[in-house]
Amino acid sequence: MIEFGNFYQLIAKNHLSHWLETLPAQIAAWQREQQHGLFKQWSNAVEFLPEMTPWRLDLLHSVTAESETPLSEGQLKRIDTLLRNLMPWRKGPFSLYGVDIDTEWRSDWKWDRVLPHLSDLTGRTILDVGCGSGYHLWRMIGAGAHLAVGIDPTQLFLCQFEAVRKLLGNDQRAHLLPLGIEQLPALKAFDTVFSMGVLYHRRSPLEHLWQLKDQLVNEGELVLETLVIDGDENTVLVPGDRYAQMRNVYFIPSAPALKKWLEKCGFIDVRIADVCVTTTEEQRRTEWMVTESLADFLDPNDRSKTVEGYPAPQRAVLIARKP
């Protein structure tokens, strides 16, 4: 059973304590009403994993846990099998005592692009919206964050996060809650808020930007990473039924348009930190994610286009500040 009591106790003593007015009731309702048909199977996989305390833990350069002496073949097989019960693994990679989870996305590459542009994370309280398996939460801790909180309603991601946490010595510096941003009150409590790979899934992107702003302290930093297209500040793509085979893609602005949106929502010091084309080396099918991936979503005769004829995915990182 995945519990959230440790998180409640943690925030009861800090500047997030006002979240306890709504959060426990929301989590209780989620536990009663909204569990996925496979959730019991996934949570059992987490429960059956051994509790491990790393002899060496690297969260600065990767998410790697090692034991002082190599695990036995039986121990490795047990961990490997239980982690494979949580497939597909999309965000990573993780290296856990000799079990290497080669995820669909090289999320470490994204982190390497983002990190140089951030304010120092040392001592910061961070929110990661749409955090997936929580890979970047661990990297935030590795970069010095005091507390990293992720929210993502996808229940498989919660189980993946808890599995990794159990193998990292039950580390309580990072937490994942099965919520969407719309379920959060205006906490105004986070020093840095990340939204990576979320904006294009929102029917109202400006509302999403306001929701992110409501989570930041004054002078707090927003890190926004999303799909963009080429163009000026008035260029926005509104795809038809699908974009790169994804149904729920609503608005893909140019980076200059996105900068303008952020300024319209009252952010200051907005800058475009990075723009890059997503490659089939960064997002691909692996033995830990065996279904279709980016290569299947691009026009086989013209890799600069999706199968629907739109510009192929490129992603921008924008940094902004709440006044």
UniProtKB/Swiss-Prot annotation:
Belongs to the class I-like SAM-binding methyltransferase superfamily. CmoB family. The gene is cmoB. Keywords: Transferase, tRNA processing. Pfam families: Methyltransf_9. This is tRNA U34 carboxymethyltransferase. PANTHER family: METHYLTRANSFERASE, TRNA U34 CARBOXYMETHYLTRANSFERASE. GO terms for biological process: tRNA wobble uridine modification. One of its GO terms (molecular function) is transferase activity, transferring alkyl or aryl (other than methyl) groups. Its EC number is 2.5.1.-. Gene3D superfamilies: Vaccinia Virus protein VP39. Carboxy-S-adenosyl-L-methionine binds at residues 91, 105, 110, 130, 152-154, 181-182, 196, 200, 315. It catalyses: carboxy-S-adenosyl-L-methionine + 5-hydroxyuridine(34) in tRNA = 5-carboxymethoxyuridine(34) in tRNA + S-adenosyl-L-homocysteine + H(+). Catalyzes carboxymethyl transfer from carboxy-S-adenosyl-L-methionine (Cx-SAM) to 5-hydroxyuridine (ho5U) to form 5-carboxymethoxyuridine (cmo5U) at position 34 in tRNAs. InterPro entries: CmoB, Mo5U34_MeTrfas-like, SAM-dependent_MTases_sf. NCBIfam families: PRK15068.1, tRNA 5-methoxyuridine(34)/uridine 5-oxyacetic acid(34) synthase CmoB. Homotetramer.
